Every structure is written in C-alpha cells, then in structure tokens.
Amino acid sequence: MSHKNLLIIFTRNPVLGKVKTRLAKTVGDKTALDIYHFLLQKTKEVTKKISCDKKVYYSEKIIEDDLWDQSIYQKKEQYGNDLGERMKNAFNDGFKKNYEKIIVIGTDLFDLEPTHINEAFKKLNHNNVVIGPALDGGYYLIGLKKLHPKIFQNKNWGTSSVRKETLKNLEKVDVHLLPMLNDVDVIEDIKNHSAFTKFLKPR
C-alpha cells in the first residue's frame, strides 16, 4: 500500500460471446468483443496515471500477461453471488487494508476521463459517498470512505432502478453526484458516437 486511496476496476474477462451480450445482438459477438477490447484500452489509458493504488478485479480468473501492467495494477478475482456482493467484498478488502478512500469503476465507459476520478477522490474529503450516474439509471462510479452494506443489497443489478434505490439507501449521508455519462451496453449507446464508427462500418 503506497497510497491512502484505492481505485478498483471491475472487468469482465474478454471472452467471445461473454461480453457486451446486448450489444452483440445487433453487431455480432466478434464486433462486440472488439468493442470491449477498445473500452478496456480506454479505461487503462484513463486510469494509469491517476495518483492512487490501483487494483483490477477480474470476473472469472486473473490474467497475468494482459493489458493491465502488473507494475501499475494489482490483480484479484471478484467473489460473491451477484454484482452487489462482489462490489461490497472488494470495498471490504480495501478498507481492511486501511485505505481511506476507495472508488470502484467498470470498463463500459468510453467518456470517462481522469478528471472524473480525481474529482471523485477530492469530493470524498467532504462527502460520505460519491456516485457517477449513468444515463441508463445505474452508475459508472461509486466512491466510499467506509462500507455502507445496504447499498449493495436487494438491487436488480443491470436495471434502470439501481441508482434510485441506491440513493434511497443513502438519504441520511452526504452524497456528491458527478456528471452523468453513458455506459456502452446497446447499439444506441454508440451508433452516433464518432469513436465507434470504425466498428459499425459494413464489412
């Protein structure tokens, strides 16, 4: 532990037919996987120079020799029955190691920038929780100074109700909301985005 702050990146192992499945219904499994690799690369570029400890949590198994440089990113496997339990466990692991501020992000966001993550750490100085709201009703970032187990329980993960239910759990604490951004889940999320044009050209 070289920093007091920890950035956790939740990632799915990039396997054909297992990632961006809703997007794949329109563009096919191969293009969906290509887009996911593109998003992984963008997430790495955004996070690699942030001044904090960084840990990648893999959905299935740790890949030693991949794009996440082990001199920058620690590596761990997610564990828990659903996304909420896996996030709760990741936060818990970090707080047990005495990190003061912990942020979790995913790898589904092209529009995420270092400024969003830096602002989240900064806002945790004066807020209990920071949330980056996603257009689909979920969130792309959550930052905590201590564990709030309720926010990870009894949620229909992947649905439009998640953020609303989470904020309801946090009515009695100070929450800062970051700018709203858009996750990449379905074709509508990328069809008018210039960064993805190369994936949508007729082949």
Give the residues covered by each predicted segment.
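Short phosphate-binding loop-to-helix
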Residues: 68-101, 159-160
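Short aromatic-hydrophobic micro-motifs that form the base-stacking/packing surface
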Residues: 103-105
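Conserved donor-nucleotide/metal-binding helix-loop-beta segment in metal-dependent transferases, i.e.
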Residues: 110-138
